C-alpha cells in the first residue's frame, strides 16, 4: 500500500510538472536521493523509476533520472542535492526523512517540486502543513503505521 501511494505521488508530481510547463517539454530531469542502502528503501527507488518509465512511454516524454545514495552522510547528501540543483532538475525525490528535509530546505522559494517517501511523521518534521493539504512544493507518503 505504501509503495503504491509513493508511485501515485510521483506520478501526480510528474504529471503536474508536465501540465504546468508553458511549452510541453520532451525531457524532464529527476533527481532521486536515497538515505541508505536498505532493501525497503531501494524498493521505493525502483518503483519510482519504473513508474516514471511507464509514465514517460504513456505521455511520450523522457525522464532523465539521476540517482544517488548518500549512505547517511550529511556532507554527501548536501553535495548530491547541490548537484541536483546545479543540473536544474525538474523534480527531486527524497527517500527518508533527512533527505526530504534537506531537499525541502534547498528548494524553498523555488518551483522545484519535492516528493518524499519513507517519512514517518511528515507533519511533525515540518515537511508538510497537513496530510490532506501539504502546501508549498513538497508532498509524498508516510511510512507511519497506526497500530
Question: Where in this protein do the model-derived segments appear?
Answer:
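Residues in and immediately flanking transmembrane alpha helices
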Residues: 15-17, 103
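Generic cytosolic/nucleocytoplasmic N-terminal low-complexity/intrinsically disordered segments
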Residues: 1-2, 20
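Short hydrophobic alpha-helices and adjacent helix-cap/hinge residues
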Residues: 2-8, 25-147
Amino acid at each position: 500500500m505504501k509503495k503504491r501511494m509513493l508511485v501515485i505521488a510521483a506520478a501526480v508530481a510528474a504529471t503536474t510538472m508536465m501540465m504546468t510547463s508553458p511549452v510541453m517539454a520532451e525531457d524532464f530531469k529527476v533527481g532521486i536521493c536515497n538515505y541508505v542502502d536498505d532493501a525497503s528503501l531501494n524498493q521505493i527507488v525502483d518503483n519510482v523509476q519504473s513508474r516514471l518509465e511507464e509514465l514517460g512511454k504513456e505521455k511520450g516524454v523522457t525522464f532523465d533520472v539521476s540517482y544517488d545514495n548518500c549512505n547517511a552522510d550529511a556532507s554527501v547528501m548536501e553535495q548530491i542535492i547541490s548537484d541536483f540543483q546545479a543540473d536544474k532538475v525538474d523534480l527531486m525525490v527524497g527517500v527518508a526523512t533527512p533527505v526530504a528535509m534537506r531537499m525541502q530546505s534547498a528548494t524553498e522559494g523555488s518551483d522545484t517540486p519535492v516528493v518524499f517517501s519513507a517519512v514517518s511523521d511528515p507533519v511533525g518534521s515540518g515537511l508538510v502543513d497537513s496530510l490532506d493539504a501539504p502546501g508549498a512544493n513538497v508532498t509524498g507518503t508516510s511510512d507511519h503505521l497506526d497500530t
